[in-house]
Amino acid sequence: MLVGQGAGPLGPAVVTAAVVLLLSGVGPAHGSEDIVVGCGGFVKSDVEINYSLIEIKLYTKHGTLKYQTDCAPNNGYFMIPLYDKGDFILKIEPPLGWSFEPTTVELHVDGVSDICTKGGDINFVFTGFSVNGKVLSKGQPLGPAGVQVSLRNTGTEAKIQSTVTQPGGKFAFFKVLPGDYEILATHPTWALKEASTTVRVTNSNANAASPLIVAGYNVSGSVRSDGEPMKGVKFLLFSSLVTKEDVLGCNVSPVPGFQPQDESLVYLCYTVSREDGSFSFYSLPSGGYTVIPFYRGERITFDVAPSRLDFTVEHDSLKIEPVFHVMGFSVTGRVLNGPEGDGVPEAVVTLNNQIKVKTKADGSFRLENITTGTYTIHAQKEHLYFETVTIKIAPNTPQLADIIATGFSVCGQISIIRFPDTVKQMNKYKVVLSSQDKDKSLVTVETDAHGSFCFKAKPGTYKVQVMVPEAETRAGLTLKPQTFPLTVTNRPMMDVAFVQFLASVSGKVSCLDTCGDLLVTLQSLSRQGEKRSLQLSGKVNAMTFTFDNVLPGKYKISIMHEDWCWKNKSLEVEVLEDDMSAVEFRQTGYMLRCSLSHAITLEFYQDGNGRENVGIYNLSKGVNRFCLSKPGVYKVTPRSCHRFEQAFYTYDTSSPSILTLTAIRHHVLGTITTDKMMDVTVTIKSSIDSEPALVLGPLKSVQELRREQQLAEIEARRQEREKNGNEEGEERMTKPPVQEMVDELQGPFSYDFSYWARSGEKITVTPSSKELLFYPPSMEAVVSGESCPGKLIEIHGKAGLFLEGQIHPELEGVEIVISEKGASSPLITVFTDDKGAYSVGPLHSDLEYTVTSQKEGYVLTAVEGTIGDFKAYALAGVSFEIKAEDDQPLPGVLLSLSGGLFRSNLLTQDNGILTFSNLSPGQYYFKPMMKEFRFEPSSQMIEVQEGQNLKITITGYRTAYSCYGTVSSLNGEPEQGVAMEAVGQNDCSIYGEDTVTDEEGKFRLRGLLPGCVYHVQLKAEGNDHIERALPHHRVIEVGNNDIDDVNIIVFRQINQFDLSGNVITSSEYLPTLWVKLYKSENLDNPIQTVSLGQSLFFHFPPLLRDGENYVVLLDSTLPRSQYDYILPQVSFTAVGYHKHITLIFNPTRKLPEQDIAQGSYIALPLTLLVLLAGYNHDKLIPLLLQLTSRLQGVRALGQAASDNSGPEDAKRQAKKQKTRRT
């Protein structure tokens, strides 16, 4: 289908055309019609670009070029005709460096729902040019990779793009729009001499104004001695090409004591190795260098290998290899119990876990035969602790630093007299040592079975605490003291001790009147089931109680009397390390229980008492409990936004019960706010069928009600004055009357209304007015009844908006379309009157509207500075006459016309004429397109004036031809959907065309070039249902005419594979033979088995032609103990339609044992062997017994294998031997 589209450049007045044209094939009639699909769109750009440099190309999904075209130079419009359905790729091919999004579009043309059939635009948007540049090494033609390069607008700091350089130093930015930019280079380690440059992008790709320069690269290495890093080794840098000025971050002063050996090298600078043995030169330009190590100790200069190393810096950082090594004394030390402390005797000092020495009485020790390096030294002494130190030993360090004790043992004992009964006795406990220094962490150890423990502690102040398990703590096990403070100085602490503790709990009960019988309970909070009770009794208002022998822990002490109020009905206490006293229970009143469906306020007073007994309670939903200070009968009244079943309730303290209040309705409020005082009516509809619709109104605004109240008050005061005047006499009436004024009514105006709703009721509130519009028009609210609904409805009313306009000059019948901004469909459509005027309203004033106009034959544009006024212009037209070179009309030509926002793609009819009317004045670009033809002019820009009608003649010349044919099955049935192709041969091998047969099996291959030979054949893809074609291809040679009757017969795929075979063997073995079929990946389970019986031939049921690998194996029941035979097997692949297999089975019978008489031939040798064995029987008999035993085992194994061989043996052969394929 070809979709023609049009849109006027000055507005929507131009009629949009959408046509579907069925066009017979050009040339001889072949009884089929070709559906032409136009795929078009725009190359779009917000900046000026040369559209003529851009090509749009259509490829098949396999990469064959189907069509190419250029763009309209005025607006970038393009159109590509398609003559076949299928999958294609549309590509934009701009000049190198230009960027577009997207670059390719995949098309699936089905003639129904694809973008081309629907007439949609395929647009390519220009995103920018490319900017190229280089980062070079100083003095070099190339540069490094990995430099970060950023692009930003000149004068700003924000980065637009970032990239990194490629090998050689090149970099590029893409999608850069015209403007002035700054390019900056950065690198985390390299120094840059020129770190920024500029570039100006106009209407093409641009190059950076100058290259960016890297001043140098960091070079590093390392030095070690016996595997340990060496500090303080100097590395001197020399070069014959690089100057000192080019080297950065390096000490250029001479090195004392160094004598150069090579006068050809120029000294540049030196660096010194660090703690970790590493050294580095911060910035060295590209070039050749020599580094020489130099190391002098306090008393000696050491050799360093290698003594000299040459290296070259290219365009990257360099790690110098190999590692430098310093090549090759007694040292003494002391072990002390603290800084400036005493020596520790008999301490064992270990060097690198190998050399061990003991300290003398003064704590000193001596290490001999030490080479330069870093060592680990560790000292050991009972109850003293030392840290392992790592120290660097060199000739200039003969005296080691003192080894100071860092910690001492802190030991103690836990004594438990009686274990609680509710837990199992434990033998071990965790003990925590915590320092007074908050920055230090806790140390935890575990006691032994006797309760002893020890810590390792540094000098300082500490406290020790036993961690009693939670179960034991709940059971009441407590130790004293809770913490043991101590101070560690320079010796171990061995006297820490903890012992067990018990306690008592006592208290008092105070009553408002006589206490009577009360029960006090003590219940452990941490030990379930441990509960003790005391029964108290007395006719006094105060009593005491005591619980003895209480284990430490948390307890709950409770007093039992449900109908009384207590200051504390229960108390939680914790027995730690002291006795517990001063526990008190005090009665405060009498309990009232109230069950509420909602949170409300209750007002109550006591019958027969004064106002001082009235109380107010704010209660929550659910069961509430509160206390009444005196007994009696109370009247309870609910106050809330809810209506209850009763207006008030009564409660008697002498008959305690639960007071239940259930709400049945809930107060809903609403407000309507308007900017004008108008008639407002509210309709409330309920979701409950039994509730009728409620109409409220006309409502009075709050301002009106306030005014009426003021008027009523003024009138009352006036009447009061008149009354007073009549009483006071005539002189009072001579005074002037008092004038009172009411407030003027000013908006906004509020209209309040309310409604009592049931729980779960859904109400719909709809306001109405003659001149107001409401926002929203109606509101719904669901009253859950869980809480006060409050103001659920808020609606605003506003005066309507009217839109008016005029057409200049006056023009009747112009269609005016009013739409809400962003809406897909128009809101209101009207036509101008005989004066060219219109008026629309009322409309919602808080919305934005768009006003458009259109009239056939006119372009209407909005008048600047007005809202809704338009100017009208008469339209122009263009007529195209397209002829063949024989001057005959040429139908079926796709003509694309575009200009501004207008575009149209139409096919010529039998007369070859196309007319475009209703065109706005301006420039247009046209391009005729038809496969197998070229046109003169091929494309052209034309200027159309207002009201002008142009006539343009176009001539088409035939450049290629078509091949027509059919594809059918052997019985003549047409084959639909077969993919065909024409493949060029010899010099035309780069050309090719493809198509698909229609429902009649017909096909047309277009665009075949004269003088070329093609093979017309089935495509390799898309024909999975076809097995083969007859012939495989047809050879055609294209002249100056179309080619007809290229017919091909195809055979559909058959998915069956037949397998048969025969066995060559003697007929006597046939009853013992089976033929088995296996899949090659599973030789354990046959998928089919066939018995031969009395026939030498066999046939398996049909297999699937699935390309799988199979194995056919012959199996026999002949006993291996009597026959020798090989079971043949053949492997094959299920390809094709049939397979015949021949198997050969030729068993041989085993020979019987030989007669004894034949033994006479070996009698003499056997006699000699017996005599020899007699002389050596002591050695030979054990050997013969062992040999006989082995031979019997081998024979038994062989017999078992022979008797049980058969199918399993054949399977093993099939797995181990390589199969024979046929």
Swiss-Prot record:
A single Gene Ontology molecular function, please?
carbohydrate binding
Q: Report residue spans for region: Disordered.
A: 1198-1222
Residues the record marks as carrying a glycan: 50, 218, 618
Q: Which GO terms describe its cellular component?
A: endoplasmic reticulum membrane; membrane; multi-pass translocon complex
Q: What is its main location?
A: endoplasmic reticulum
Q: How does it assemble?
A: Component of the back of Sec61 (BOS) complex, composed of NCLN/Nicalin, NOMO (NOMO1, NOMO2 or NOMO3) and TMEM147. The BOS complex is part of the multi-pass translocon (MPT) complex, composed of three subcomplexes, the GEL complex (composed of RAB5IF/OPTI and TMCO1), the BOS complex (composed of NCLN/Nicalin, NOMO and TMEM147) and the PAT complex (composed of WDR83OS/Asterix and CCDC47). The MPT complex associates with the SEC61 complex. Due to the strong similarity between NOMO1, NOMO2 and NOMO3, similar interaction pattern probably occur for the three gene copies.
Q: What is this protein called?
A: BOS complex subunit NOMO1
Annotated source species: Homo sapiens (Human)
Gene that this sequence comes from: NOMO1
